[in-house]
Swiss-Prot record:
SUPFAM superfamilies: DNA repair protein MutS, domain I, DNA repair protein MutS, domain II, DNA repair protein MutS, domain III, P-loop containing nucleoside triphosphate hydrolases
Location of the region described as Mispair-binding domain in the Swiss-Prot/TrEMBL record: 228-342
Species, as recorded: Mycosarcoma maydis
Key word ATP-binding present: yes
Cellular localization per UniProt: Nucleus
Protein family (similarity comment): Belongs to the DNA mismatch repair MutS family. MSH3 subfamily.
Gene expressing this chain: MSH3
Protein name: DNA mismatch repair protein MSH3
Length: 1154
């Protein structure tokens, strides 16, 4: 075959490795000389196919080798050519021919044929391109089926996973870099010369087979040809992977291998199932791969499934590795990132959807990490009563919440905190009490099924150990003043000794320590133990820095806020509806008009924790009213200022963790600069906002102006948006290591330019310049006709129909040095950027955090102002009462409406008037009436008005005059907890007991149909007992008691502060089947339930309706006769003068017919 036009006579190319079978002479493994030893009589070529008929490119390491673009498979003539041709050697140079001949004489025919086949398979892959992997895929499927019994990997799973179009990857037959290094290291002993590796293979080892055959043999566990052993022989890479798995048990590892991210072993099987990707055997381990650019997407999916995911990176760079003494050993790999659902920190480019899977549907807030510690209360009469300490961290926002509380058998207090804090991961001690275990299991589920991930700690430290661990953590970070003595570690010290020491430190902390240390040493004991567990856990994720900022700490229990328990959140549909379990139709859906992510998160905190401080409530209401009216020009600009802001709270958190990119840093600083420039402190006198709260937060925005501009002036915004860390800083002297690396690269660039002048002279082309193709730089491109003029020592990289591209030896040498300087520059730039962000957060975090917090507050106030503009909303008027006075809270609401129903319902809502604990009304209402008459709707509207008023919102009423409540307790509905072993009645009674144990005279209590979960007799007795208990308290709370037990109405005679009321209706007949008309208005007195009417409307069969009506009439007559008999008996048992009409009326009222 004639040589191609671009090939110089005597110049080597890939075509020279082929020869027809008829003219082929026997060859040996050592038939090819080392490239470094080839004389100048032979030009060097790349490993890819030279062609003049189409574009072809080659990527030199560290770039990945490209393949031929064979979309329709190899052409027929190419396949025919492969069947006719075999490999033969280039003629070696004279100086090595004698050595090669000697080695050839020592090779056996079997070794020669095996080596020929290995070379044949390698070049066949190069010729056929990606379609060569098809046959291997078929064999891989057979191997997976064979290994399924050992790995529990079913055939159906593998078949399903290969159907994924987005993430399923074609198996690449290219050897991994580490595997190539393994083969080179194994063959770098005296022996014959190998054409493909450039190294000699030992004569004592068998001839190497193709990668395909080697993979299959190792996967099936077949012994080597030499019979050295019967078990699997692990490569250095596989040994490294097994060591990593042993070091990190329970972690699903994603390992960087070359330019790929891979799962191995059982992790590959799990990833194949969870991600719907292909799993295939590779040597001794199952393997699955994902694209590098979709790492964050797949990590999210895995952690949402409840897995703990680790990312193992190569910490050595290619250029520096090649220049080191360990060039032929595996890359050093370490766990560089660890993720769970609670520790995942999204970047600013991700969509801010708080209702997505990474948030919680119950509270629509970011998931948190919670540590729970409990301790039995000694000396308590109830053996199952415990003290519980918790610490919860939201890593996306930096908020850290702590609390310690006493809880009963039902663990309702723990349930309330879980509902508010919405943990995605919970750390618990090795053992908990059975009631606590049941509550956690019922509420949090199983992480493996997509629920909350529960991690049980190996051991729980006592207070002594926890205190020493926490104080050491803060002392090591320089957060403790030198005057504060170090906590000694006394092996025999008791918990009481450490407690006394902690108390001593706390007493003097205000004068000698930072505010953070003062807070830490004053934490409750169980909370401190939980904090120690949180810090230790976060250190593995490199997120512990969030615990070093005092502004992030807050107590869950506060005297200035109202605590809504989990039942109230569910029954009043605060965050989600009861039926659809969606946000639409909930209170948060009605109020959320925020424009920023920070504002939406803060609004949820306001709604879940209404204020009890009347002065703060007045401040909020003044601000909402001012924003609603919009009289000030400053207030009218707020809406445009807040529009389009990124999630600055999350951005600051990423900066604190050291995970922010230059683009995110620029985004945060530019957004803060735009906000702080909008309001100037020296113009505050002209704002006239009529709200001290708004003025305070506007001044807070202005206070961050100088800080933001200082750091903005140090960086280049253009380079930051391009994520260019090397050219990010305007002052090059700030980070000299960067400039030194740049200078070294500039020297190499100068030598490359000087070498280019030499090439121009050699080729007589004054305008010649380097070109870059497919990621390969510094290519010398010449026309095909001139290709024969280039020196033979140039390396031919790629060719097209018209052009041929080369690398000169000097270019390759200088490129290697330049790559080393480039990687040094990248490392220096990374360290400089981390230092820049670290110093920014250390010195100015509080200022920037205050600016972001003020933006969130203004956003929430604007949202409430938008709600206040709706028709029929009024500003609530709070009635002041002495804080220490034991008195019921007055409530007077005129024209009260259900704020949500009037929006979602097509029918107009009927308003009602409610008054409690006022001069003309008592503290309790006994509410009866028809089924579907609107009883539950009225009490829900009452609860919503109180909550909306105490978060600082206008309310849906004509007039609202209320006092400040410290809690709203709502018990409604019937439900069981089968998985926790609690029946409907047990749940009902337990929730009622929790309310009775927590209420005060300043609480609002709403009980709906108590006692329905058992027999009528027992239910009536329970309802009567609970109602009487509430009425006989020294200072009874405001109570609305819904019931169908009309006998309870008699209590009004004994307790004047109880009023009987019902939902009105109209009816023209006493026939149970005649229609009634519901009025939906509150009226004094009692009323029947009309349950048979409701059953008739529900379309029960008429036969059942008639039967029920007959039974009801009989029971009514029987009870009426018994009541009349009791009246007459009482009348004749007393003197005639007492048997007056009033006495008869009293007796009839005491025993009314039901």
């Amino acid at each position: 075959m004639p040589p191609p036009p671009s090939q110089k006579p005597g110049q080597a190319s890939i075509s020279a490795f082929f020869k027809p079978k008829s003219s082929q002479r026997p060859i040996t493994k050592s038939c090819q000389p080392d490239r470094a030893q080839v004389s100048n009589g032979y030009a060097r070529t790349s490993n890819l196919l030279d062609t003049d008929t189409g574009a072809s490119s080659s990527a030199q390491p560290p770039h990945k080798r490209s393949k031929l673009n064979n979309k329709d498979g190899p052409r027929r003539e190419t396949i025919d050519r492969m069947s006719k041709w075999k490999f033969t050697a280039l003629q070696p140079s004279d100086n090595v021919s004698s050595e090669l001949d000697e080695a050839a004489s020592q090779a056996t025919p079997t070794e020669r044929s095996q080596h020929d086949q290995a070379r044949h398979d390698a070049f066949r892959k190069t010729l056929l391109g990606p379609n060569f992997a098809i046959d291997r895929h078929a064999s891989n499927q057979m191997q997976i089926d064979d290994m399924s019994s050992a790995h529990t990997f079913s055939h159906s799973e593998s078949r399903t996973s290969t159907g994924t179009k987005v993430d399923a990857m074609v198996v690449d037959d290219d050897d991994d870099d580490d595997d190539n290094q393994h083969e080179q290291a194994a063959q770098s002993v005296p022996g014959t010369w190998n054409r493909f590796t450039g190294l000699a293979a030992p004569e004592s080892t068998p001839a190497p087979c193709s990668h395909r055959d080697s993979s299959m043999n190792k996967t099936k566990g077949k012994p080597k040809a030499s019979g050295a052993g019967t078990g699997p022989s692990y490569t250095p890479l596989e040994k490294q992977i097994l060591e990593l798995k042993a070091e990190h048990p329970g972690v699903l590892l994603i390992i960087e291998v070359g330019y790929k991210l891979k799962f191995y072993g059982e992790d590959a099987r799990i990833a194949s199932k969870e991600l719907s990707i292909m799993c295939f055997p590779e040597r001794n381990l199952l393997t699955a791969m994902i694209p590098v650019h979709r790492l964050h997407i797949h990590v999210k999916r895995l952690i949402q499934a409840g897995h703990k995911v680790g990312v193992v990176r190569q910490i050595e760079t290619r250029a520096l590795k090649a220049a080191s003494k360990n060039a032929y050993t595996p890359f050093v790999r370490k766990l560089t990132a660890l993720y769970t659902a609670s520790t995942w920190v999204d970047d600013l480019s991700s969509l801010d959807d708080l209702a997505a899977n990474m948030g919680d549907a119950y509270t629509n807030q970011p998931k948190s990490l919670m540590a729970i510690v409990e301790q039995s209360e000694r000396g308590n009469a109830q053996a199952d009563r415990v003290s519980i300490g918790i610490v919860s961290v939201e890593v996306n926002t930096g908020h850290l919440t702590y609390d310690q509380f006493s809880d009963g058998h039902a663990r309702s207090e723990l349930e309330t905190r879980i509902a508010h804090l919405a943990p995605a991961e919970v750390l618990i001690p090795p053992q908990l009490t059975k009631p606590t275990e049941k509550v956690i299991s019922y509420l949090l589920g199983n992480g493996a099924d997509g629920g909350v991930r529960i991690e049980r700690l190996a051991a729980m430290p006592d207070y002594n150990q926890a205190f020493q661990s926490v104080t050491r953590f803060y002392r090591d970070r320089g957060l403790e003043s030198p005057e504060v003595p170090e906590v000694p570690e006394v092996p025999g010290s008791s918990e009481a000794d450490t407690t006394r020491l902690a108390t001593t430190l706390a007493d003097g902390a205000d004068k000698r320590s930072s505010p953070l240390i003062s807070l830490i040493v004053s934490l409750p004991q169980l909370s401190l133990i939980a904090l120690a567990q949180i810090i230790q856990h976060l250190q593995a994720f490199q997120l512990e820095s969030i615990c070093t900022l005092s502004t992030n700490f807050r107590s869950f229990s506060s005297r200035t806020t109202m605590l809504l328990n989990s039942n109230t959140l569910a029954n009043l549909e605060i965050f989600r509806t009861a039926n659809e379990q969606t946000e639409r139709g909930s209170l948060i859906w009605l109020l959320d008009k925020c424009k920023s992510a920070m504002g939406r998160r803060l609004l949820r905190k306001w709604v879940s924790r209404p204020l009890t401080d009347i002065d703060k409530l007045q401040e909020r209401l003044d601000a909402v009213e001012a924003l609603r009216d919009g009289k000030s020009y400053v207030l009218r600009r707020l809406d445009s200022v807040l529009h389009g802001l990124p999630d600055l709270e999350r951005g600051l958190a990423r900066m604190t963790y050291g995970r922010a990119t230059p683009t995110e840093l620029a985004t945060v600083l530019l957004s803060l600069n735009r906000v702080t420039q909008e309001f100037k402190a020296d113009e505050a006198a002209t704002w006239k906002t009529q709200s001290s709260l708004i003025d305070t937060h506007l001044l807070s925005l202005a206070s961050g102006k100088q800080v933001v501009q200082t750091y903005l002036n140090q960086i280049s915004i253009k380079e930051a948006r391009a994520n260019n860390k090397a050219d990010l800083y305007l002052d090059a002297d700030v980070f000299p290591a960067i400039q030194a690396s740049k200078d070294n690269m500039a020297i190499i660039d100068g030598e490359l330019r000087e070498h280019l002048r030499e090439i121009r002279k050699l080729l007589h082309r004054p305008s010649l310049d380097y070109v870059s193709v497919a990621g390969v730089d510094y290519l010398v491109e010449v026309r095909v006709a001139d290709a024969k003029k280039v020196p033979v020592e140039w390396l031919r990289v790629s060719a097209t129909k018209s052009m041929v591209r080369f690398h000169t030896p000097e270019v390759m040498r200088l490129s290697k040095i330049r790559d080393q300087h480039k990687e040094t520059l990248d490392a220096a730039a990374q360290e400089a950027f981390a230092r820049f962000v670290r110093e920014l957060c250390k010195s100015e975090y509080v200022v920037l955090r205050n600016v972001v917090a003020s933006l969130a507050v203004l956003d929430v106030l604007l949202s409430l102002a938008h709600v206040a503009r709706a028709a029929g909303y009024t500003r609530p008027v709070f009635l002041r009462q002495p804080q220490d006075a034991e008195a019921s809270v007055p409530v007077e609401i005129i024209g009260m409406r259900h704020a949500i129903l009037e929006v979602v319902s097509a029918m107009p809502y009927i308003p009602n008037d409610v008054s409690l604990s006022t001069g003309d009304s008592g503290a309790a209402i006994l509410l009866s009436g028809c089924n579907m008459g609107g009883k539950s709707s009225v009490v829900r509207a009452l609860g919503l008005v109180i909550i909306m008023a105490q978060i600082g919102s206008f309310v849906a009423a004509d007039v609202a005059r209320i006092g400040v409540h410290d809690a709203v307790y709502v018990r409604m509905g019937a439900r069981d907890r089968m998985f926790s072993g609690r029946s409907t009645y047990m749940v009902e009674v337990s929730e009622t007991a929790d309310i009775l144990g927590s209420l005060t005279s300043r609480s609002m209590v709403i009980l709906d149909e108590l006692g329905r979960g058992t027999s009528s007799r027992d239910g009536y007795c329970l309802a009567a007992g609970v109602l009487e208990y509430l009425l006989t308290l020294g200072c009874p709370p405001n109570t609305v008691f819904i019931t169908h037990y009309l006998q309870l109405a008699s209590m009004q005679r004994r307790y004047p502060h109880l009023r009987n009321m019902h939902m009105a209706f109209t009816s023209n007949s006493r026939n149970l089947l005649d229609p009634i008309h519901l009025v939906y208005k509150l009226r004094p007195g009692i009323a029947h339930s009309f349950g048979i009417h409701a059953a008739h409307l529900a379309r029960l069969p008429l036969q059942i309706i008639h039967s029920a009506s007959t039974i009801s009439s009989a029971l009514y007559a029987k009870h009426t006769n018994r009541s009349a008999f009791l009246v007459l008996k009482h009348a004749f048992a007393n003197p005639p003068q007492l048997a007056t009409v009033s006495t008869l009326q009293h007796l009839l009222f005491t025993h009314p017919p039901t």
